[in-house]
Design a protein with these regions (language model features):
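N-terminal catalytic or cofactor-binding beta/alpha core of small enzyme domains
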Residues: 2-63
């Protein structure tokens, strides 16, 4: 569950039942002319989306 999409009430409720918050981080840098600058940010976010699909609402993905 992406924290960015929750309102403050939903976030407070989620924190009462979820004990895992993950912060995907990465550098913004060039990886050649063929890759986007955000490659190191895009990959961890996608990885967490796949984990979320398996875990359901058992983790919060922080911005």
């Amino acid at each position: 569950m992406y924290m960015l999409y929750l309102n403050s009430d939903q976030f407070a409720e989620a924190l009462e039942r979820i004990d895992t918050v993950v912060l995907p981080i990465g550098m913004t840098e060039a990886h050649g002319h063929h890759c986007p600058l955000g490659t190191d940010v895009i990959i961890p976010r996608r990885f967490l989306e796949l984990i979320e699909e398996r875990m359901g609402d058992e983790l919060i993905i922080a911005p």
